């Protein structure tokens, strides 16, 4: 986590849904991934995502400018009409950032079979995006892991 920056923008409406999705996966621009982060009651609308940690040395204002430029490419001018912008630069947080001796590969151990097994006669189950063999490290991986874990629990409680 220490190598990323978490960002969030709030809006008056979920205009991105008109363009099909609030989900972004990109290899171009500062935002590699972003999600619709609106509440279930549909009273709060936001986009939440991550920036590459290399942007930690760029000013908050410049990061926001780059984010809005990328969002405008996806969603149009409405992306610049945000209500609030928040960010956490994990690199600056003492308890979540550790200097690395070398380049950190993304999601290097995620999806390993050891994370998909149950332990203690099926009573100890690991769950989370890191355990998913598909899309591990991403929201889709978390959803798949949750479904897999639910299936394991159903099977466990049948007995």
Model-flagged regions — what are they?
Residues 1-19:
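Central helical "cap/lid" subdomain
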Residues 19-159:
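Conserved flavin/dinucleotide-binding core of flavoenzymes
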